[in-house]
Structures are given as C-alpha cells and as structure tokens.
Amino acid sequence: MIYRKWSLLSGPPVILGGAVIAAVAVGFVLQNVTKGEQKKNVSTNK
C-alpha cells in the first residue's frame, strides 16, 4: 500500500521533471551551437 502511494506520487513528477530537464538541455545545446556558428561567421568575415 505504501509502495503504491509512493509510485503514484512520484511517477508523474519524475517523468515530467525528466522531460523538462531534457527540453532545457536541448535548448542550452542549441543556443551554444548557434552562438558558436555566429562567432565563427564573424571571425571569418573580418
């Protein structure tokens, strides 16, 4: 009974938390990639 309550309370938050963390990580990586490309373009244009 305790395990079932624990799993019901922790299941959805863990899944949602993982999805949020993954989305933030993807956004962070994409920002770094685009910033890196912009820096390369600026340095090659000079």
UniProtKB/Swiss-Prot annotation:
GO CC term, one of those recorded: mitochondrial inner membrane
UniProt subcellular location: Mitochondrion inner membrane
Biological or metabolic pathway of the protein: Carbohydrate metabolism; tricarboxylic acid cycle
Keyword Cytoplasm attributed: no
Membrane spanning residue stretches: none
GO biological process, one term: tricarboxylic acid cycle
Record key words, sorted: Membrane, Mitochondrion, Mitochondrion inner membrane, Tricarboxylic acid cycle
Domain of life of the native organism: Eukaryota
Keyword Transferase: no
Membrane topology: Peripheral membrane protein
Subunit structure: Component of complex II composed of eight subunits in plants: four classical SDH subunits SDH1, SDH2, SDH3 and SDH4 (a flavoprotein (FP), an iron-sulfur protein (IP), and a cytochrome b composed of a large and a small subunit.), as well as four subunits unknown in mitochondria from bacteria and heterotrophic eukaryotes.
Protein name from the UniProt record: Succinate dehydrogenase subunit 8, mitochondrial
Organism for this UniProt entry: Arabidopsis thaliana (Mouse-ear cress)
Taxonomic lineage from the root: Eukaryota, Viridiplantae, Streptophyta, Embryophyta, Tracheophyta
Name of the encoding gene: SDH8
